């Protein structure tokens, strides 16, 4: 499946006032699968617009409650395991190619609502940045280590 392309998307490392990172548990997997908010870009959508749209769709957090700090220097990639490649994306994509953003959350915990129109998460929490690689699914661990490395000066 090396000839398949990467799906273009965005992700966000959202920090609260205590420099803890927002992490949420997916509701479409049997095992616990925690991650930061992420998603695909729509046609002709800029990464900045896309990441704020995805964040609001997944968490109910509107753009006015977020201050973008920076983004990764390059687009980062990861490959899907074969079973996910087949089940989630019908073997259309090899994995994802994402631009990641670092942002400050300006709202309150009560403003977060994962029970959206199309809920993607069943739980959420604030975690220490260094906990992320051990919290998420194994195939995303190298990606999360790159994200942490790139944003380390701001954490």
UniProtKB/Swiss-Prot annotation:
Its cofactor is a divalent metal cation. Residues 5-149 form the Nudix hydrolase domain. GO terms for molecular function: bis(5'-adenosyl)-pentaphosphatase activity; guanosine-3',5'-bis(diphosphate) 3'-diphosphatase activity. Gene3D superfamilies: Nucleoside Triphosphate Pyrophosphohydrolase. It holds the Pfam family NUDIX. Its EC number is 3.6.1.-. Keywords: Hydrolase. It is an enzyme of class 3 (hydrolase). GO terms for biological process: nucleoside phosphate metabolic process; ribose phosphate metabolic process. A motif (Nudix box) lies at residues 39-60. Accelerates the degradation of transcripts by removing pyrophosphate from the 5'-end of triphosphorylated RNA, leading to a more labile monophosphorylated state that can stimulate subsequent ribonuclease cleavage. Belongs to the Nudix hydrolase family. RppH subfamily. NCBIfam families: PRK00714.1-3, PRK00714.1-5. This is RNA pyrophosphohydrolase. The lineage of its organism: Bacteria, Pseudomonadati, Pseudomonadota, Alphaproteobacteria, Sphingomonadales.
């Amino acid at each position: 499946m090396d000839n398949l392309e990467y799906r273009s998307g965005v992700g966000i490392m959202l920090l609260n006032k205590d420099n803890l990172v927002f992490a949420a548990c997916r509701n479409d997997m049997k095992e616990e699968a925690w991650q930061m908010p992420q998603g695909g870009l729509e046609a002709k959508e800029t990464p900045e617009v896309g990441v704020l749209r995805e964040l609001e769709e997944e968490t109910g957090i509107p753009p006015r409650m977020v201050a973008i700090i920076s983004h990764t220097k390059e687009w980062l990639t990861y490959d899907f395991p074969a079973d996910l490649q087949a089940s989630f994306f019908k073997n259309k994509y090899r994995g994802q190619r994402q631009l990641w953003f670092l942002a400050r959350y300006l709202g309150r915990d009560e403003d977060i609502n994962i029970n959206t129109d199309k809920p993607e998460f069943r739980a959420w929490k604030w975690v220490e940045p260094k906990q992320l690689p051990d919290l998420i699914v194994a195939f995303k661990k190298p990606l999360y280590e790159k994200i942490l490395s790139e944003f380390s000066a701001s954490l």
